[in-house]
Structure formats: C-alpha cells, structure tokens
Amino acid sequence: MLRIAVPNKGMLSEPAWNMLAEAGYRLRSNPRQLVVEDPDNDVELFYLRPLDIAVYVGRGTIDVGITGHDLLVNSGTDAEEHMQLGFGASTFRFAAPNDSPITKLEDIEGKRVATTFDKLVHDYLVEHGINAETVHLDGAVESSVQLGVADLIADVVSTGTTLRNAGLRIFAEPLMHSEAVLIRSPRLEADDERLTILSRRLQGVLTAQRNVLMDYDIPVEKVSAAVDITPGFESPTISPLHDKQWAAVRVVVPKAKVNQLMDQLYEVGARGIIVTALQASRM
C-alpha cells in the first residue's frame, strides 16, 4: 500500500482532508484514529503532526505526505517536493514589538529571535550575514517577547491578525512564501504508478476547484466569436439545436473569470448562459 501522511491538526489539516475526500480516498471516521486503511485505493493514511510529516517522508518511513513548503524546508530532510496543492498560502515574516527600534533586517544583529522554524531562520540569517540567536519554541511564539524570552519573532503569517493582537509589527521582506505541497520520499520514484495516480487525482480536484462548466446558446453566425471568448482546454463542444439558426456550446472556463465571460458572451449574442460547478476532473 502507498503510505500517505496527512496533517492531524492545524490550518492545513481540514483542506488536506477535504482534498483527499474529493479525490476519492477514505478518511477516518473517528478523530482518535491515527491510521486508516483504504484497500479500494491501495493506500494507508497516517494522521501525523504537521511538523513531523517531512521527517517521516524524508526517512522513507512514509511514501508521500501533505505538509507546508515552509515545514519541508525547515525539516532539512531529503523529502522532495512533488506538487503544489493550491491551499494554505502564507508568508514567513519577522515581527517585533510596536515600540521596538528593530525596523529592518540589519537590526536583528545580536538579537534573540523566537521561532518554531529555527533551521529556516538560522539559514536565512547566515545567508544575509547576520549573527543572532534563534530561540526554539513549539508554538505561541508571539508571547515570547512579552515574557522576555526573545527580542523579536519569526513566524508564519496568514492575515497578521494574531501578531497585531499581540502588539507586534511585521518588518523586512518575507523570509519565504509557502503553501501546502505534496512531498515524496527519495526512496519512491517520481514515476511510481501509485504516486502518478494520486497526483492525477489531486490535480483533478485542483482543476475542478478552479474551473466551472459553462453552457450557452448562440446564433450560428456568432459561434466563431463566442469560441474566441471561451476556447476551453482543447476545444468547446458545439451541438446543433432544433432551431437551425442556433447552436449550443459547452465549455470549461476559469471560475475567476465567469462573470466577465458571461458579459462578453451576452454582448455577442449568447443567451441561456448557465454555469455548473465541477465535482472532479481529468484534463
């Protein structure tokens, strides 16, 4: 069986579970379950701490896993990034107290930086020629400055609300941009059939999430103009209607552009324009 690690908690967990469910994999029915066998798909799911997933995959104990790009880099393991999964977008930033004189990267020299990602921060500071102490904490790093453990922090930022509520101010450029990724063990070949099937399914979910199915009727003489607006992946499906002066068009279009496309199609004569969500896909 293909052994797949998924986050058991945190911001990546629920989107990862949903994605696997939409890809047809069986999930746990009890939150206390740590391992789920899915014989129909020849996989085993292991619910692990997000911080540990890259370690297990890097050592070959687990074949593939879903984790954050930042967690992968910080792990320092041999696990390899296989594909981006389109959720969990975040940045990794420095933050200091609002009244702190620390306002730029150079000001970190000689300071204490609290973080869960000590390797990532250490490597970044060394790369920029800055000597500072990294203080490893397993969580809630935003409290470390107030408690006197550190002078500033480095942490994952999604909206920045938590930092602002803690009286912290973001400064300097992001250390890293991150999102959820599928990683694989160095012992698992990139063209392994089981990995190919998993990747194809996940890509199908991504495609379904980002696109919709659009149907509309168009006068025959306007078909070319309509196809220019909605060319689809390969080509739209065009079918004759009972009224020979009209044709029906079915095409996959980007979800983000639906309303603009509907406006453009209406302007060239399309009518009966409807949009349907996609559940799954293989493109």
From Swiss-Prot:
First-listed, main subcellular location of the protein, grouped into a coarse class: cytoplasm
Record's keyword terms, sorted: Amino-acid biosynthesis, ATP-binding, Cytoplasm, Glycosyltransferase, Histidine biosynthesis, Magnesium, Metal-binding, Nucleotide-binding, Transferase
Function: Catalyzes the condensation of ATP and 5-phosphoribose 1-diphosphate to form N'-(5'-phosphoribosyl)-ATP (PR-ATP). Has a crucial role in the pathway because the rate of histidine biosynthesis seems to be controlled primarily by regulation of HisG enzymatic activity.
GO molecular function, one term: ATP phosphoribosyltransferase activity
EC number(s) on file: 2.4.2.17
GO cellular component, one term: cytoplasm
Species of origin: Bifidobacterium adolescentis (strain ATCC 15703 / DSM 20083 / NCTC 11814 / E194a)
Annotated localization: Cytoplasm
Catalytic activity: 1-(5-phospho-beta-D-ribosyl)-ATP + diphosphate = 5-phospho-alpha-D-ribose 1-diphosphate + ATP
Protein name: ATP phosphoribosyltransferase
Gene: hisG
Keyword flag Phosphoprotein: no
Biochemical pathway: Amino-acid biosynthesis; L-histidine biosynthesis; L-histidine from 5-phospho-alpha-D-ribose 1-diphosphate: step 1/9
